[in-house]
Amino acid sequence: MALTNSSISFRTVEKTKLEAYQVIEQYGLTPSQVFNMFLAQIAKTRSIPVDLNYLRPNKETLAAIDELDSGNAESFFIEASENYSAEEFTKRILNGGQ
């Protein structure tokens, strides 16, 4: 199978581009080489090789976490061996597991 070249175009903030290009240059690479390495890593690992830990939970999630931490969260049990449709499962959850 013959490999063919493809091009990608995207928009970015000029300041970010200039700062990134300076770093890339310090490594003795070109932006094209770095972007190709980035895409190859994504394809190889089936993941994005960027630290996404900066993602923060929203207000609702933080409130739910606080509720759990305080011990005031409503709990219920649904038998794992029982089979439910998505609709039945949702009804069970909304009815406190009943």
Swiss-Prot record:
Antitoxin component of a type II toxin-antitoxin (TA) system. Its cognate toxin is YafQ. The gene is relB. The keyword Protein transport does not apply. InterPro entries: Arc_rbn_hlx_hlx, RelB/DinJ. Signal peptide: none annotated. Pfam families: RelB. This is Putative antitoxin RelB. NCBIfam families: RelB_DinJ. Keywords: Toxin-antitoxin system. GO terms for biological process: DNA-templated transcription; regulation of DNA-templated transcription. Belongs to the RelB/DinJ antitoxin family.
